[in-house]
Amino acid sequence: KPTVRQTQELAKYYHRPFGVFFLPQPPLIPPLAADYRRLPGVRPGVESPEFRLALRVMLQRRELAVQLHEELGFTIPEFRTAAHMSGGPTQVGQRLREVLGVTIEQQMGWRDEWQAWREWRSAVEQAGVLVFQFPKVPLEQTRGVSVLDFPLPAVGINSKESSPGARIYSLLHELVHIALALGKEETVALREPRSDTQWMEVERFAEEAASEAIIPQSALEQQLRGITVARDGWDVG
């Protein structure tokens, strides 16, 4: 039988609350895949230890945020933007951009990419989605993940991603998945029935919608038209 000190060390090692070791029987813990969206290359139930820990921390923090809102009498902000693949990625991206309230003028005024990351993160949180960052998970496993629990869904971004631009893209990509889940277009990894090929269609949709949300095609074309390309000496056209 372990001593109190040894039990404390066990709790620290397994990243579990100290009181769990004094329960009459082990608690029933639902599979992590019952909360997060399907991820390419990640099989539900056989996640890496690093990723499992990151997910548990995300879920604990989300639950704490919900409890604090309830105990303090605050209204839990609700993300209500449902997306449907039949609408097309361009329309979904434009709708998300409207909900977040980010304008081209604001983007042009941001000092650098790190300010852009902070502004996008703040906009997503104000829309009713928690945003966390998790360390120690290799980028090859995942750059981002979303927890499809409502109200107050959550997005996790891999802090190993050194580029703020890449973090922004991952953030909006996960937001698209949350919107698709609200629209009943996808569900948690444990219950997602589609084949790998079918799922890649969902991923491509999310990629295109996220790109449109960050930089609308119309705005990009307008910016490109304003660029004057100098003729080189070899240009005889």
Could you describe each region identified by the protein language model?
Residues 1-237:
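Short juxta-domain linker segments that transition from a proline/glycine-rich
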